[in-house]
Design a protein with these regions (language model features):
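Active-site core of metal-dependent hydrolases
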Residues: 171-244
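Divalent metal-dependent hydrolysis catalytic cores, especially in the metallo-beta-lactamase
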Residues: 71, 87-116, 132-146, 173-185, ...
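Conserved phosphate-binding/catalytic loop of the ribokinase/pfkB sugar-kinase fold
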Residues: 146-171
């Protein structure tokens, strides 16, 4: 199937369902130039092209997804601490429509986490492979969490939130750490911690047993995210809403 319209060096993908800003799928096509979407069109307005047209066979076309919390895939874990593992993770994610990632760490010893973060920073600087999802950031799930809600995290490595250690993480990652989880009830210094680092990293409530009052104070201090809401936190009830 061919259409004809002078549009130099463009790629046209026709016969797809495009996810639009009004949250609807509309049948049409996409015109790409270089790495950018130049235009989209509805099927009823299909122009004529002189370039080759690729038939999308009725596939759904959506913006690239961003995964902010996962630990690995296809046998590789972000905490393997190798550039090769990160590369394989990023390539697989891109193959399923995820174009940017912020993989999560586990609760490990501080020095081990620093090494993992350093490796990620090196990978970020060196990677040029367009087939891979962009390493947008890192989501630190611990070590500043609650033993009572540790889940699969290793309790031996759990410590209270600490500004100096957080700064070490930020330095090791060259600023790539974008989220850091804390259990605010585990330290009297939690509010000061949040106020100290909130301009450098997003503070999450994660693996926490905080009650409503403690969680509210943390959010008012600058925390802005909750990790896997409802999971690894107190159950929601009308008398004790907790973090939720």
């Amino acid at each position: 199937k061919k259409f004809y319209l002078r549009r130099e060096n463009a790629m046209i993908i026709d016969n797809v369902y495009i996810y639009t800003p009004d949250k609807k799928f509309v049948k049409g096509g996409i015109i790409l130039k270089g790495e950018q979407i130049q235009a989209v069109y509805e099927a009823k307005d299909t122009p004529k092209f002189e370039e080759e047209v690729f038939d999308g066979n009725g596939a759904y076309a959506i913006p690239g997804l961003i995964d902010l919390h996962f630990h690995g895939c296809k046998g590789d874990d972000f905490c393997d601490g190798t550039k090769e593992a990160i590369g394989r993770i990023a390539e697989y994610e891109a193959s399923i429509g995820v174009t940017a990632i912020a993989p999560a760490t586990m609760t490990l010893p501080v020095e081990e986490l620093e090494h993992i973060l350093e490796v990620a920073a090196e990978y970020k600087k060196e990677n040029t492979d367009k087939r891979r999802a962009d390493l947008l950031g890192i989501n630190m799930e611990g070590p500043f969490i609650s033993p009572a809600k540790k889940g699969a995290q290793d309790e031996r490595n759990i410590i209270p939130c600490n500004v100096e250690i957080c700064e070490r993480f930020l330095k090791a990652s060259d600023g790539l750490v974008k989220f850091i989880g804390i259990a605010p009830e585990e330290s009297e210094e939690a509010i000061d911690f949040i106020k100290s680092v909130k301009g450098k990293v997003n503070v999450s409530l994660a693996h926490t047993n905080a009650d409503y009052k403690t969680a509210k104070a943390a959010f008012e201090a600058g925390a802005n995210h909750a990790v896997h809401l409802y999971n690894a936190m107190p159950p929601f009830s009308h008398r004790a809403p907790g973090v939720v």
